[in-house]
Design a protein with these regions (language model features):
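Bacterial N-terminal signal peptides
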Residues: 4-16
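A domain-start/cap signature at the N-terminus of enzymes
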Residues: 16-56, 66-69, 80-83, 109-111, ...
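The conserved beta1-alpha1 loop
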Residues: 58-62
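Active-site machinery of serine-nucleophile hydrolases
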Residues: 63-126, 246-249, 255, 262
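Short beta-to-alpha linker loops that shape the active-site pocket of alpha/beta-hydrolase fold enzymes
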Residues: 89-93, 173, 270
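Conserved acidic catalytic loop of the alpha/beta-hydrolase fold
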Residues: 122-139
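The feature captures the conserved acid-bearing segment of alpha/beta-hydrolase catalytic domains
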Residues: 166-254
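C-terminal catalytic histidine-bearing segment of alpha/beta-hydrolase fold enzymes
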Residues: 226, 243-289
């Protein structure tokens, strides 16, 4: 009987996920489901009245798993751009800790996991499915993440095909620097050989991306702050880590003669706060506008 509760939870989860019918999302706030079975992902949606040809903002939550909040915090931005918001929910039960933000590629002891459990291709499926349902797979879209969501995106761009007009990574706790002498999560060491080549780094640095930093994000402790020795090699605080990540990557691109399509935007007087970062006026510059 000790397996009864997880089993019941799983059944309820699948029922909940299958309750939304696929197709064009309704106007206003809503929820849809993408994928089937244990790959089903709940997506919180907002669509302004009369939405037709506008872009889609895919919002990636952090460790608090508050995708609904990210949807709500993005409504003003969506209205301004006559854009749709889609915020996928990567639940704690299936995507514990780094199984979400680091892609779930490796186990804790560094062994390769089954690709079916990786969070990166699941996100790609969400993006492609939503675009297709809304009638245009080539519609302009943006990937925006804060904290753990930014960790997710800065790693995602090296692993998955990216068709977004721009990726915006705000206040990530750590980054995967494009180097092999640091293990995965902080660098690309210990990954399968297919991800340990310069082609991956080139792809990563050529992807249009904004490293979006709150200048007051300088705390050295907190519930979800990585204070490990590996993390501190990147910098002592999130602001410093973001700056170092950008500068290291920029220098590598220059050294290799690659295109460097990143920008860095800093927001004064804002710390580790997704709502404030999303609704600051500088988000326009971060989006490339």
């Amino acid at each position: 009987m000790r397996f009864a509760l997880p089993f019941v939870f799983g059944i309820l989860h699948l029922v909940q996920m299958s309750s939304a019918s696929p197709g064009v999302a309704p106007e206003g706030k809503g929820e849809v489901s993408v994928g089937e079975g244990d790959r089903a992902i709940q997506v919180f949606i907002y669509k302004p009245k009369g939405f037709s040809k506008g872009p889609i903002f895919f919002m990636f939550h952090g460790a608090k798993r508050n995708a609904e909040d990210y949807r709500n915090w993005s409504i003003a931005l969506a209205e301004k751009h006559h854009a749709m918001v889609a915020a996928p929910f990567f639940d704690q039960e299936r995507f514990l800790a780094h199984l979400y933000s680091w892609g779930g590629i490796l186990t804790k002891d560094g062994k390769l996991r089954d690709r079916k459990g990786w969070s990166f291709p699941i996100a790609t499926e969400v993006i492609q499915t939503i675009l297709k349902r809304e009638g245009n797979p080539k519609r302009d879209h943006y990937l925006i993440g804060h904290s753990g969501g930014a960790q997710f995106l800065t790693r995602y761009v090296a692993i998955e095909p990216v068709t977004a007009k721009r990726v915006v990574a705000a206040n990530a706790g750590t980054y995967a620097f494009p180097r092999l002498d640091w293990d995965w999560g902080y660098g690309f060491g210990k990954l399968p050989s297919e991800f340990q080549n310069e082609g991956r780094f080139k792809k990563m640095l050529e992807t249009p991306m904004t490293v979006y930093l709150g200048m007051a994000d300088t705390l050295t402790e907190g519930e979800n702050f990585d204070a490990s020795a590996d993390a501190n090699l990147e910098g002592k605080v999130r602001l410093e880590r973001g700056r170092n990540f950008f500068e290291y990557s920029q220098k590598l691109a220059k050294q290799k003669g690659w295109k460097f399509n990143w920008t860095k935007v800093e927001v004064p007087n804002v710390g580790h706060d997704a709502n404030l970062m999303i609704n600051d006026l500088r988000i326009e510059k971060a989006l490339g506008n």
